[in-house]
Amino acid sequence: MIAKRLLTELDLRDFKALSLYEASIEESILLILSSDHQIEDIKNFHSAINNSVAAALQDKLIIFGVTPTYPATGYGYIKSEKQLDHNNYSASKVDLFIEKPDEKTAKLFIEDKKYSWNSGIFVFKANTILNEIKRFSPEILENCENCLSKSVKDLDFLRLNKTLFLNCENIPIDISVFEKTKKAFVIPLNCGWNDI
């Protein structure tokens, strides 16, 4: 996979920048990730990403789940319909998102095996996520479209209008879309992931 264009957020807006891509790339597959994640096993990371594309092409919104290694209270958790198969990267429907549980609850999640850490890494088709944003958070899409209309192309970058961008609400896409949609699926990610 090779990025054709790059879009960076001017300030933290929890992935709202992705909806600015509506113009001209609605059929594109998008990989959304944070700059503060550590990935130790690049080969497994690439395998997980490449395997997620087939699911994204079926209009599934993919989020990656990391097998918990300890009862973390600083991460969100994802409950999947079935236990994730870490050998074949198969997608399982998301049952529930849980934000930063207490230690006792986190221990129960580890024992259950249907729970994984929310990596905050996403793959989906642009038009699929745009339709879900329009359905569940239309005001976010409207603000982002206004920002896009005043952006400037610069080589491979799209430079956003800072004033309009800062008007976009700062709400995670997990909350604004993924917790509400029926199209959310989780794929296992075993690559030495760490949120630094």
Spans of features found by a protein language model:
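Catalytic core of tubulin tyrosine ligase-like
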Residues: 77-196
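Short, intrinsically disordered, charge-balanced linker/junction segments flanking boundaries
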Residues: 6-12, 191-196
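Residues at structural and domain junctions
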Residues: 4-7, 38, 64, 92, ...
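Conserved beta-loop-beta/alpha segment of the NTase-like Rossmann-fold superfamily
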Residues: 7-84, 135-136
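Short coil/turn connectors at secondary-structure junctions
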Residues: 2-3, 26-28, 57-61, 73, ...
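Short hydrophobic/aromatic-enriched beta-strand-loop microsegments
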Residues: 3-8, 141-144
